[in-house]
C-alpha cells in the first residue's frame, strides 16, 4: 500500500498556491469577496473602485471615484499593537483604481508599560545632561567673575564664591560618574569607582554646608546684630569644607564593612549607612529654615522702614537664600517621597526631580552672582573702563593733549640761543 500525502504537506502546498495566486485575477476576486463579507454593502452608481485588501491587511470597501475613504488602523502589524481609534486614508482614483499609497500617518503605536518607562527614562537623562551642562557653564562664569572682581571681595561674597565652587565640583564629579560608571564597572566594584562615588557625595554634602554658611552669616548679621567684622573666613571654611570630610569618611567606612558593592551606589534593604551623610544634610537644612524664619521676621518688623544700602543687600540676600533653600530642600526631600503607582504621578516625579536636581547650579549662579548688584556694578565699571581705554575718542583726546603749536619752543632751541 502506497502511503498518501501527509496533511502538513498538503497545507504547505495550499498556502504556497495561495501566495503565488495573490496578485492574480482569481486572488483579486477572493479579496473582493472577503472585503464584501466583512463590510456593510454600499450601493454606488457610476465609476467606482472595487473592494480591495492592501498589503497590511486592511479592507477597503467598494467606493465611488474621487472619494477619500477612511478605515480604522490595523490592530496589529508585525507584532506591534496600534491604536484602532485613529484612521488610515486611501483615495479612490478617477480611473477606478485605488491609490498605491495608503496614509497611515495617524496610526500610532500603543507603547507597552516597559517601552513607556524607557522613553521617559531617556527624556529624563537628556534633561539631566542639559541641566548639568547649563549649570556648569553658568557656574564657571560666576566663579571667574568673583575671582577677577577684587573690589567686591568681602566676607559675604567670599561665601557666595565658595558655594559656587562647591557646586562646580559637584557638577564636575557628576559628569565623571556618568561617563565612567557602567554596569561592568558597577559589578567589578573597583577601588577607583568607590572613590569617585565618595567624592561626589562629599561635594554633595558641601553644597548643603555652604548653604548653611549662608544662613549663619545672615542670621548673625541681622538677628543677633553682631558686627560681621567679628566673623572670620576660616570659620566658614571649616563649616563648608572641613566638617563634611569626616562625615564622608564615616560613611565610607560603613559602606566598606556593611554595603561594599556596586561602587557604593544605592543601598541594600535593611542597611542604612547612607543616612550617615544624609542625616547631617537634613539637619543643616532644617536649621537653615529656622534661621531664615527668624531673619524674615526681623526684616518684616524692625527693618521695614530702613532704606540703607546694607539693609537692601541683606533683603536681597535673604530672598536669594529663601529661593535656593527651597530648591535644595524640595529636591532632596523628593528622594523620600513615594510617587505612588499612578503613572502620571511617577512621570511628573521623574521630570520634576530631574529638572530641579540638574539646574540647581544655574539657580545658584543667577541669584548669588548675576543678580548681585555689587557684581553687576563692578562689571559695569570694568566695562566702562575698558571702553574708555580702547575707544577712538580716548585716543583722539590723548593725541590732542600733546602741544603742536608753531610757537612752541623746544629745549634744543633754548640751548642753542643761550650758547650764542
Curated annotation (Swiss-Prot):
Q: How does it sit in the membrane?
A: Multi-pass membrane protein
CDD domains xref list = 7tmB1_CRF-R1
Q: Cellular location of this protein?
A: Cell membrane
State the superkingdom. Eukaryota
Which residue spans belong to the Extracellular compartment?
A: 29-116, 180-194, 259-274, 337-343
Give a yes or no for keyword Transcription regulation in this entry. Answer: no
Q: Name one Pfam family in it.
A: HRM
Do you know which SMART domains this protein is assigned to? HormR
- Keyword list, A-Z: Cell membrane, Disulfide bond, G-protein coupled receptor, Glycoprotein, Membrane, Receptor, Signal, Transducer, Transmembrane, Transmembrane helix
Q: Which family does it belong to?
A: Belongs to the G-protein coupled receptor 2 family.
Q: What does this protein do?
A: G-protein coupled receptor for CRH (corticotropin-releasing factor) and UCN (urocortin). Has high affinity for CRH and UCN. Ligand binding causes a conformation change that triggers signaling via guanine nucleotide-binding proteins (G proteins) and down-stream effectors, such as adenylate cyclase. Promotes the activation of adenylate cyclase, leading to increased intracellular cAMP levels.
Under the subunit heading, UniProt states: Interacts (via N-terminal extracellular domain) with CRF and UCN.
Domain characteristics, as noted in the entry: The transmembrane domain is composed of seven transmembrane helices that are arranged in V-shape. Transmembrane helix 7 assumes a sharply kinked structure.
What protein name is recorded for this chain? Corticotropin-releasing factor receptor 1
Origin species, per record, is: Gallus gallus
Taxonomic lineage of this organism? Eukaryota, Metazoa, Chordata, Craniata, Vertebrata
Q: Which gene is this protein's source?
A: CRHR1
Amino acid at each position: 500500500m502506497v502511503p498518501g500525502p501527509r496533511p502538513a504537506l498538503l497545507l504547505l502546498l495550499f498556502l504556497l498556491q495561495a501566495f503565488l495566486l495573490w496578485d492574480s485575477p482569481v486572488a483579486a476576486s477572493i479579496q473582493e469577496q472577503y472585503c464584501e463579507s466583512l463590510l456593510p454593502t454600499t450601493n454606488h452608481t457610476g465609476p467606482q473602485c472595487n473592494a480591495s485588501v492592501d498589503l497590511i491587511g486592511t479592507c477597503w470597501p467598494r467606493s465611488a471615484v474621487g472619494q477619500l475613504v477612511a478605515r480604522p488602523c490595523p490592530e496589529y502589524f508585525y507584532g506591534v499593537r496600534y491604536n484602532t481609534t485613529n484612521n488610515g486614508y486611501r483615495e479612490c482614483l478617477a480611473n477606478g483604481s485605488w491609490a498605491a499609497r495608503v496614509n497611515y500617518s495617524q496610526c500610532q503605536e500603543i507603547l507597552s508599560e516597559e517601552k513607556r518607562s524607557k522613553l521617559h527614562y531617556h527624556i529624563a537623562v537628556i534633561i539631566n545632561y542639559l541641566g548639568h551642562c547649563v549649570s556648569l557653564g553658568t557656574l564657571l562664569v560666576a566663579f571667574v567673575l568673583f575671582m577677577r572682581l577684587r573690589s567686591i571681595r568681602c566676607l559675604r561674597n567670599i561665601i557666595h564664591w565658595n558655594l559656587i565652587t562647591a557646586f562646580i565640583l559637584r557638577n564636575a564629579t557628576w559628569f565623571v560618574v556618568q561617563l565612567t560608571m557602567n554596569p561592568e564597572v558597577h559589578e567589578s566594584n573597583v577601588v577607583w569607582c568607590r572613590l569617585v562615588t565618595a567624592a561626589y557625595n562629599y561635594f554633595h554634602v558641601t553644597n548643603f554646608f555652604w548653604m548653611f554658611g549662608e544662613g549663619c552669616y545672615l542670621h548673625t548679621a541681622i538677628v543677633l546684630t553682631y558686627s560681621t567684622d567679628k566673623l572670620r573666613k576660616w570659620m566658614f571654611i571649616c563649616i563648608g569644607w572641613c566638617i563634611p570630610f569626616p562625615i564622608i569618611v564615616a560613611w565610607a567606612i560603613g559602606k566598606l564593612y556593611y554595603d561594599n558593592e556596586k561602587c557604593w551606589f544605592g543601598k541594600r534593604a535593611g542597611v542604612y549607612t547612607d543616612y550617615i551623610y544624609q542625616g547631617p544634610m537634613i539637619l543643616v537644612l532644617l536649621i537653615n529654615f529656622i534661621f531664615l524664619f527668624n531673619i524674615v521676621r526681623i526684616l518684616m518688623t524692625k527693618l521695614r522702614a530702613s532704606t540703607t544700602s546694607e539693609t537692601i543687600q541683606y533683603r536681597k540676600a535673604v530672598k536669594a537664600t529663601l529661593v535656593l533653600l527651597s530648591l535644595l530642600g524640595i529636591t532632596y526631600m523628593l528622594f523620600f517621597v513615594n510617587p505612588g503607582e499612578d503613572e502620571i504621578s511617577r512621570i511628573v516625579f521623574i521630570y520634576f526631580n530631574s529638572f530641579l536636581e540638574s539646574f540647581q547650579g544655574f539657580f545658584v549662579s543667577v541669584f548669588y552672582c548675576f543678580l548681585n548688584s555689587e557684581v553687576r556694578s563692578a562689571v559695569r565699571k570694568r566695562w566702562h573702563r575698558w571702553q574708555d581705554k580702547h575707544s577712538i575718542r580716548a585716543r583722539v583726546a590723548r593725541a590732542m593733549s600733546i602741544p603742536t603749536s608753531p610757537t612752541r619752543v623746544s629745549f634744543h632751541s633754548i640751548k642753542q640761543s643761550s650758547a650764542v
